[in-house]
Design a protein with these regions (language model features):
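Conserved beta-strand hairpin/beta-sheet module of binuclear metal-dependent hydrolase folds
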Residues: 1-48, 119-129, 135
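Short glycine-enriched, charge-decorated loop/helix-capping segments at active-site entrances
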Residues: 138-145, 184-188
Length: 224
């Protein structure tokens, strides 16, 4: 399997390129606009044909490369069915499978960080977007986020996965590249709670500043 993890320093965003082998179909998860040419060059170097681009949710801290990649490659653009994005050509439902040339992903609806947040499982790993981070979780105070929904997504959808499941988030701010469900259950400070109310108390009092790109990124990612 080809599995590439790329990093955007400005927004601390991880992008993933996945394919079964050289010369096959590929998909990209959570691409950043400024790196579009890097992605296409890498695809060309590996003789890969991009067929799907997935965004885990409408991002507020960077402009997605989804629309630009669609323009350049004629790939399908994929998000969960709750998205309001006008860029998307395929909306997937909760538990729906995405198949490309030997690779299978399964969509999980995980609202909380935003109301359109989805995670995607693939074999031994899960792409968690901003829902579950390494030693953290996504904020819930904008884009129709909801801390109790986030708690349910975390504890009823993600943390029930096998503990050895690898966690690949959309962001990391400390140089971590991946974790596991077991490690997050044991060590993630935001998951050491006993109820949705306790989790909401933490999340509703973070008092974080809005992302610098929010006023530009959200409209761009909704409208292309």
């Amino acid at each position: 399997m080809i599995f590439k993890q790329l990093f955007d320093e400005k927004s601390s965003t991880y992008t993933y390129i996945v394919a079964s082998d050289k010369g096959r179909e590929a998909l990209i998860i959570d691409p950043v606009l400024e790196h579009t040419s890097i992605y296409t060059d890498l695809l060309n170097d590996l003789d890969l044909r991009l067929v799907k681009v997935i965004d885990t949710h409408i991002h507020a801290d960077h402009i997605s490369a989804m629309a630009e990649l669609k323009e350049r490659t004629n790939c399908e653009t994929v998000m969960g069915e709750h998205t309001k994005s006008e860029v998307v050509s395929l909306k997937v439902k909760d538990n729906e499978k995405i198949n490309i040339d030997g690779i299978v992903l399964q969509a999980l609806y995980t609202p909380g960080h935003t109301d359109d947040s989805y995670c995607f499982t693939m074999k031994d790993r899960i792409f968690t977007g901003d829902t579950l981070l390494i030693n953290g979780t996504g904020r819930t105070d904008f884009q129709n986020g909801n801390s109790k929904d986030a708690y349910n997504s975390l504890f009823e959808r993600l943390l029930i996965l096998p503990e050895e499941t690898l966690v690949y988030p959309a962001h990391d701010y400390k140089g971590n590249k991946h974790s596991s469900i077991g490690n997050e259950k044991k060590n993630n400070p935001r998951l050491q709670v006993n109820s949705a109310e306790e989790y909401a108390e933490i999340m509703d009092n973070l008092n974080l500043a809005n992302p610098q790109m929010m006023d530009v990124a959200v409209p761009a990612n909704l409208n292309g």
